[in-house]
Curated annotation (Swiss-Prot):
The chain crosses the membrane at residues 15-35, 46-66, 76-96. Its main location: membrane. Residues 36-45, 97-105 are extracellular. It comes from Buchnera aphidicola subsp. Acyrthosiphon pisum (strain APS) (Acyrthosiphon pisum symbiotic bacterium). GO terms for molecular function: cytochrome bo3 ubiquinol oxidase activity; proton transmembrane transporter activity. Keywords: Cell membrane, Electron transport, Membrane, Oxidoreductase, Transmembrane, Transmembrane helix, Transport. This is Cytochrome bo(3) ubiquinol oxidase subunit 4. Residues 1-14, 67-75 are cytoplasmic. GO terms for cellular component: cytochrome o ubiquinol oxidase complex; plasma membrane. Heterooctamer of two A chains, two B chains, two C chains and two D chains.
Amino acid sequence: MSSFLNFNMNKEMKSYLLGFLFSSLLTTLPFLLAIEKFFCSEVNYIIFLLCAISQIIIHFVYFLHLSFDPEERWNLITLLFVIIIIFIVVFGSIWIMFNLNHNTM
């Protein structure tokens, strides 16, 4: 019984638990703000955006274990490449759809 009370979590488990707590908080905060309407809608949008960006960063740090260590530089370069490709695909598709709509109207 005493080993249960004095258990020692490793560093990875602490990271996952802390990330889960932060992401849970950053998920419930926008829901509460949307339901209770504490602020005007413009302030809520800004808070939602900040919560979303911080949750992305928390997922990268605590769950994907991305850091700025020299050993993990390739992971960051790969992530940057993926973000650029997604940006090109999404905004290229929007641009094509806008031009198609403009040319057909």
